[in-house]
Amino acid sequence: MNCFGKSACLALALAGIVGAAAGDEDQAQAGRQVFDQRCRTCHGGTARADLPLGPSLAGIVGRRAGTGASGIHSRPVMDSGIVWDRASLRRFLSNPQREIPGTLMAGSATNRAELESVLDYLETLH
C-alpha cells in the first residue's frame, strides 16, 4: 500500500472513531432525557441524589451495589455482591425483582433503545 493509501485508510478510521464518539454523545443525551423523565424523582440529579430515596447514580459503573453516600440502599441489593457494569445494570434495569429479589427499585426499562441510552448516560456520570 502506498503512502496515499495508508493516509486514506487512517483518515477513514479516524472519521469512524469521531463519528462513533458523536453517536455515543447523542445516545448519552437521549439517555439523560429518559433519566430525567423516569429516574430523577427517586435518584435525584446528575451528580448527587437530591432526595433521600434511591441512591445517587453518579459513579455507579464500577461501584459495588448497595454502596454510596446518599439514598436508601435495600439489604438485598447490599448483599447481592454485584459490582455494577453495563451488563449487570442492563439485567437489573430490565427486571429489578428478577435480578435482585426484594430490591426496593420500583421501575424497569420499557424498551431496549431507551435502556441502552440510559446506560450510555450512566457511564458518563462520575
Q: What is each PLM-predicted segment?
A:
Residues 1-9:
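Bacterial N-terminal signal peptides that target proteins for export
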Residues 8-17:
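Bacterial N-terminal signal peptides
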Residues 16-34, 45, 49:
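Electrostatic cytochrome c docking/interface patches
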Residues 29-36, 50, 58, 87, ...:
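Sequence context surrounding c-type heme c attachment/ligation sites in exported
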Residues 31, 36-45, 118, 122:
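The canonical Cys-X-X-Cys-His
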Residues 32, 44-83:
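Gly/Gly-Pro-rich "capping" loops immediately C-terminal to redox-active cysteine motifs
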Residues 85-126:
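C-terminal capping alpha-helices of c-type cytochrome domains
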